[in-house]
Swiss-Prot record:
Coiled coil: none annotated. Contains a chromophore consisting of modified amino acid residues. The chromophore is formed by autocatalytic backbone condensation between Xaa-N and Gly-(N+2), oxidation of Tyr-(N+1) to didehydrotyrosine, and formation of a double bond to the alpha-amino nitrogen of residue Xaa-N. Maturation of the chromophore requires nothing other than molecular oxygen. The precise stereochemistry of the tyrosine has not been determined. Signal peptide: none annotated. This is GFP-like fluorescent chromoprotein cFP484. It comes from the Eukaryota. The modification 2,3-didehydrotyrosine is found at residue 105. Belongs to the GFP family. Fluorescent proteins have become a useful and ubiquitous tool for making chimeric proteins, where they function as a fluorescent protein tag. Typically they tolerate N- and C-terminal fusion to a broad variety of proteins. They have been expressed in most known cell types and are used as a noninvasive fluorescent marker in living cells and organisms. They enable a wide range of applications where they have functioned as a cell lineage tracer, reporter of gene expression, or as a measure of protein-protein interactions. Pigment protein that is green in color.
Length: 266
């Protein structure tokens, strides 16, 4: 009887020891899983290097046009370049700058996000997302933009509709007096289950001074994704080169997401 008791006790101790080892291994595995960088969970869908194909159909103050383009981007570095060409409606009788943000700020999946901010945009693929933007200029000019962004293999596909109206004939847009968009910051926050972005933006003018414009964008993922907390996206958009009439243009953007740089005391 004593031998049987010792045997049973030994077996019980061994079972408890093995169970503890198993639980520790499971905990270690769970901890390692939680530490996997966010980028690795989306990299199977979105590659480190992505191609871009786009088409914009638009109308500004009654002038219709079509622009097509291709490019390349690094979604996890926050940079991309586009080569664009006016296919219909050339030469454009207005400043090209008002179009550029619909191409570059148009795909936030090409923004560099840190691991501690949920990347609403990359999560949305392969289904993709759409967005709508209103641009209100200081001289009462208005732009409405809609874009649908999808994915085919290693390429982002943009279908863009751009409508501008009420630009004064003697204003900086119709007189082509703008030089570039200044660097800016988009405020990102959740409202009614979608992501909203606000920007107070400025165009540098020939001879000095600035031309103000307020952006409001609504981003809608095509599937349920994790929503981010209130954050910011810093971005700079530049025209690298262009021909005389801006029929062919190369654009570049750098964009990085972040929380506030100021520490909280609350």
């Amino acid at each position: 009887m004593k031998c049987k008791f010792v045997f049973c006790l030994s077996f019980l101790v061994l079972a408890i020891t093995n169970a503890n080892i198993f639980l520790r291994n499971e905990a270690d595995l769970e901890e390692k899983t939680l530490r996997i960088p966010k980028a690795l969970t989306t990299m199977g869908v979105i590659k480190p290097d992505m191609k871009i194909k786009l088409k914009m159909e638009g109308n500004v103050n009654g002038h219709a046009f079509v622009i097509e383009g291709e490019g390349e981007g690094k979604p996890y570095d926050g940079t991309h370049t586009l080569n664009l060409e006016v296919k219909e409606g050339a030469p454009l009788p207005f400043s090209y700058d008002i179009l550029s943000n619909a191409f570059q700020y148009g795909n936030r999946a090409l923004t560099k996000y840190p691991d501690d901010i949920a990347d609403y945009f990359k999560q949305s693929f392969p289904e993709g997302y759409s967005w709508e933007r209103t641009m209100t200029f200081e001289d009462k000019g208005i732009v409405k933009v809609k874009s649908d962004i999808s994915m085919e293999e290693d390429s982002f596909i943009y279908e863009i509709r751009f409508d501008g109206m009420n630009f004064p004939p003697n204003g900086p847009v119709m007189q082509k007096k703008t030089l570039k968009w200044e660097p800016s910051t988009e405020i990102m926050y959740v409202r009614d289950g979608v992501l909203v972005g606000d920007i107070s933006h400025s165009l540098l003018l020939e001879g000095g001074g600035h031309y103000r414009c307020d952006f409001k964008s609504i981003y809608k993922a095509k599937k349920v994704v994790k929503l981010p907390d209130y954050h910011f996206v810093d971005h700079r958009i530049e025209i690298l080169n262009h021909d005389k009439d801006y029929n062919k243009v190369t654009l570049y953007e750098n964009a990085v997401a972040r929380y506030s740089l100021l520490p909280s005391q609350a």
